A protein has these predicted regions:
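Single-residue signature of alpha-solenoid repeat helices
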Residues: 40, 79-80, 115
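Flexible helix-coil transition and linker loops at the boundaries of alpha-helical arrays
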Residues: 48-60, 87-95
Length: 685
């Protein structure tokens, strides 16, 4: 063959190949523009392999980026690899947005350090971008947030999930918490039909989603799951081929909401017309004779090309929250609201920057208490869609400011967490998540909030630690609680407390002084047990006060002594009808005159401190005994110092016969400050 002819043949082939790739890219771009991301991704993938890394670097980078975008928008984990391919082709020189989206994908996968770097690169060019700022901030806080934990408990609702299918957006049918619907792409036969849903979605590549329903039986178990009756007729009618008829195998249905009586359902619906996906709409269906009636489109905008979905009604049914990419929002998918006027929904408006971001806010839900719940990938979170709750700031009347809370690590984590619903006014319900799913299948989880339990428990003893089995407790609370009961035989007690209450507890026992404790259960976020052991001082004998110290030969109180005396202040306040003798004692060193004078001054210093802190002077008698009343050893002291016999008086004769080290111990024991009750009828008569 002539070499010239061969050259021109090869050149023609190359030209035809190039033209073919260009046409395929244009076709993929069109599919991307109408939201058929899965189909577009396949086309971009085939084009990428046909382009040269040198000659077609820019175009190859564009194709890889668009492929990554397709995967990102349908939460396909292959997005990260596509973005890496685009970066190798220097696509960032064309559009730095790749750093933002790559950061989102990496965060979605739990690769927080890499995500933070990607966000930083994007912020270099766009320092004021909220989504990038939120993403970077979240990546730095993940470990801290995980440690905070959450009171909510979750578990997979296995009865609703099916292997290799997605199941999401559970919703109770109005106030009936024994009936539930959810979206699923499982391949079930319609009731009374023979066909299965086979046609995959051009958007996600998964089978089409339909609305399924289930109910609880008398035993409280969820019964067999079946297609929502009346919304599916198993095939495509002639009318549905050319109209927006909601019945038929090509239609896709999803997130729904109900009026409180369960008779009206609003749901998300999407159906291709003439082979083209025109986006989602919201439809209404009324229930009669056990089946859902012919759905009718809910008009929210004059422009019929605007996509709307994810309806959520408030408790009164006069406000509709929904999701749209309509002009006037913050970008991406935003949450909007409209008001009911007769049969029409009017005054559609976005919720504003407190809720919406340039990313996506979806799956709104309004709790019975008025709290708004939704999913977002634009606010600080764990990656992908996170669940948030929002309440209006009540600082100002009619405020439009929202206070936002991330639902925490029980709900949120790597992947998407979304589509929450509650059982009436409780904090129990269901939500959707693809956590731990490598292929991204959504599952339904149940959640519940355990009741917070507050307990007061402890032991009532004498000052030596012996249980007082005949002690009594009186509990008074700011909520009206006023209870009196005996401790157990072993001196212990235990009782439940209420939330947001201030408590006072008084312990009494014959022959002993009272003891009082105060505490509260205000602003607690988790269960708590208060352990309060009370030691009651005897009335009949002196009580040694520990940790009362003075400088050598001085009577001024040290800081440690003042702290100990504050306990005596409290005891006198808890027992307002007693008077006491407060006595100070010295060791055997020094003259009698010196020790008597020193001990009297020390006793007076203690009384002066008590008077300074509000104790009446008439209730106090300071006495300095010097060294005239040495300690007599009891069983408790003998247990600590076995070499001191029980009933032994630590007098000068006994001490001088001991070795020097033991003499010093005895001197320390004799150096003490005590009090004893003199009267128990102060101001009673």
């Amino acid at each position: 063959m002539n070499w010239h002819k061969l050259f021109y043949i090869l050149l023609a082939i190359l030209c035809l190949t190039g033209c073919s790739v260009q046409r395929k890219i244009k076709r993929a771009d069109k599919k991307f523009a109408i939201g058929e991301y899965y189909t577009a991704a396949d086309i971009y993938k085939s084009c990428y392999g046909q382009l040269s890394a040198k000659k077609d670097r820019e175009l190859k980078g564009y194709v890889a980026y668009r492929q990554g975008e397709c995967y990102r928008l349908i939460n396909n984990p292959r997005a990260a690899n596509a973005y890496q391919s685009a970066l190798r082709c220097k696509y960032q020189l064309q559009d730095s947005t790749i750093f933002l989206h790559a950061g989102q994908v990496l965060q979605y996968q739990g690769k927080y350090k890499d995500a933070a770097k990607s966000y930083e690169l994007y912020l270099e060019a766009h320092p004021d971008n909220y989504v990038a700022q939120a993403g970077k901030y979240a990546c730095s806080k993940i470990d801290e947030w995980k440690k905070e934990g959450s009171r909510y408990k979750i578990s997979e609702a296995k009865e609703f999930n099916q292997r290799r299918t997605s199941n999401f957006a559970p919703m109770f049918i109005g106030d009936n918490t024994d009936a539930l619907v959810f979206a699923s792409n499982r391949q079930e036969k319609p009731k009374g039909g023979s066909k299965k849903l086979q046609r995959p979605s051009n958007v996600t590549g998964q089978q089409l989603f339909q609305i399924y329903q289930t109910r609880k039986n008398a035993a409280g178990e969820w019964e067999e799951i079946e297609l929502a009756e009346g919304l599916y007729d198993g095939g495509e009618s002639e009318q549905s081929k050319d109209s927006a008829d909601t019945k038929g195998g090509t239609a896709e249905m999803g997130v729904c909401t109900f009026t409180r009586d369960g008779r009206t359902m609003l749901f998300t619906y999407s159906k291709p017309i003439n082979g083209q996906d025109l986006g989602a709409k919201i439809y209404r269906s009324d229930r009669a004779s056990g089946e859902w009636g012919e759905p009718q489109e809910v008009k929210l905008f004059l422009d019929s090309s605007i996509t709307v979905g994810h309806p959520a009604l408030n408790v009164t049914g006069d406000t509709l929250y929904f999701v749209s990419d309509a002009p006037g929002g913050e970008g991406g998918k935003d949450i909007w609201m409209a008001e009911l006027d007769g049969e029409n929904w009017l005054n559609a408006q976005p919720l504003g920057k407190g809720i919406n971001t340039a990313a996506d806010e979806m799956y709104p839900y309004v709790h019975a208490d008025g709290t708004l719940y939704f999913a977002s990938n634009g606010h600080p979170g764990y990656g992908g869609l996170d669940l948030y709750k929002a309440t209006r700031d009540t600082t100002f009347k009619d405020s439009t400011v929202w206070v936002l809370y991330n639902m925490g690590p029980s709900f949120n984590g790597v992947g998407d967490d979304f589509g929450i619903t509650f059982e009436g006014e409780t904090q129990n319900g269901f939500f959707s998540s693809n956590k731990g799913e490598k292929k991204g299948y959504d599952k339904i989880y149940r959640f519940w909030l355990p009741e917070m339990e507050f307990i007061a428990e402890g032991l009532v003893t004498d000052e030596q630690g012996n249980p007082l089995s005949d002690a009594q407790l009186r509990i008074v609370g700011s909520d009206g609680t006023n209870s009196k009961f005996n401790v157990r035989r072993d001196g212990t007690y235990k009782f439940k407390l209420n939330r947001e209450v201030k408590y006072v507890m008084l312990a009494t026992c014959r022959g002993h002084l009272n003891a009082k404790e105060q505490w509260n259960t205000l602003n607690l976020k988790d269960s708590k047990t208060y352990t309060m052991n009370l030691a009651l001082s005897p009335i009949s004998r002196p009580v040694k006060m520990e940790n009362i110290f003075y400088e050598f030969g001085r009577w001024e109180l040290t800081q440690a002594s003042e702290t100990e005396l504050l306990h005596l202040v409290k005891l006198l306040e808890d027992n307002p009808n007693i008077t006491i003798e407060l006595s100070a004692h010295t060791d055997m060193k020094g003259t009698d005159e010196f020790n008597n004078d020193l001990s009297q001054k020390r006793a007076q210093s203690c009384c002066d401190f008590l008077i300074k802190h509000g104790i009446e002077r008439e209730r106090l008698t300071p006495v300095g005994y010097g060294k005239t009343k040495p300690v007599i050893c009891d069983k408790a002291l003998n247990k600590k110092y076995p070499w001191i016999p029980v009933e032994q008086e630590l007098n000068e004769v006994f001490i001088t016969a001991l070795p020097d080290d033991k003499q010093e111990i005895c001197n320390q024991i004799n150096r003490r400050t005590e009090f004893k009750v003199v009267k128990t009828t102060y101001k009673l008569y």
